[in-house]
Amino acid sequence: MFPFCDSSSPMDLPLYQQLQLSPSSPKTDQSSSFYCYPCSPPFAAADASFPLSYQIGSAAAADATPPQAVINSPDLPVQALMDHAPAPATELGACASGAEGSGASLDRAAAAARKDRHSKICTAGGMRDRRMRLSLDVARKFFALQDMLGFDKASKTVQWLLNTSKSAIQEIMADDASSECVEDGSSSLSVDGKHNPAEQLGGGGDQKPKGNCRGEGKKPAKASKAAATPKPPRKSANNAHQVPDKETRAKARERARERTKEKHRMRWVKLASAIDVEAAAASGPSDRPSSNNLSHHSSLSMNMPCAAAELEERERCSSALSNRSAGRMQEITGASDVVLGFGNGGGGYGDGGGNYYCQEQWELGGVVFQQNSRFY
């Protein structure tokens, strides 16, 4: 059985009393100590199938040996409970932050080196890269010239081109200097990077501003050219879409009316020609039309222009009425369907006489008006 608290066994004493250590010393770990109770959790977890009788026997054997003799024996080395003290958290954090900072700085330096591997130059337009990309045609011509000159670098070819065209560049610079005066007094640089000698006089060392040096004789030529070809006035954004005035709208309406009248006249002409063809086909080559039919046909042909004039008059009246009601001029879009029919009792031209009727259908302001008129 397990020992109880009231037993006189030395195993009932605390561990630090058994080892004769001071109470202020750190507490030892029971799982790693020499004396371990049989029922301790580390021992039981290590081997759950360990026989209980063997555990009790080993505890009794340990009781037979005094703990003082075991501790004081020279065979057992005395080891410290903690070989190395844990490092403070502040030192670990400082080391980690230092490592991260050094890594970030290296990454930034590497990124900067990858981003800008070539040095840039400062120009009037700001910082610019020394590299440039040529089009296909220009690149072919450029490298052909480089092969002819025998240069091994593109910079030498460009320098040769600049030296060759130095006179033309100086003329351009003189023209710019004559048109614009530099107020800050800063001297410009020539093609080869030195001070421009065009700004200095040959005899003396005093300089003049750019506005007073060469190129003054070209000013009148530019002025005369500008006076000869005046530029058209620029249209502002507000005048781009101007609303037409009343006269322009009235003229547009008048042109629309003329087009509508011409369309009606052409329609009447087509209808008259179609009627003549049908009448000739109905009469036949053997039957000659009588005098009544001829007079009827001639009167019908004479009535066609009258009907057209009447239609135009009605259109004019309807437009005037709509203008009065609306209070302003409106363009009337009308769609007229004219149906002409000729017939008699026998279904053609005969003694019964002819009947002519005109059916009109007008659309005014979304309302459809239908009117039938007959002419005998």
From Swiss-Prot:
Annotated ranges, domain TCP: 114-172
Cellular compartment(s): Nucleus
Residue ranges of domain R in the record: 246-263
A GO molecular-function descriptor: sequence-specific DNA binding
Compositional bias per record (Basic and acidic residues), positions renumbered to this chain: 207-219, 243-261
Effect of substituting residue 266 to I: In strain: cv. Sabanero
UniProt xrefs under PANTHER family: TRANSCRIPTION FACTOR TCP18, TRANSCRIPTION FACTOR TCP4-RELATED
Note from the entry: TB1 is a major QTL of the evolution from the teosinte to the maize morphology.
UniProt name for this protein: Transcription factor TEOSINTE BRANCHED 1
Biological source species: Zea mays
Gene giving rise to this polypeptide: TB1
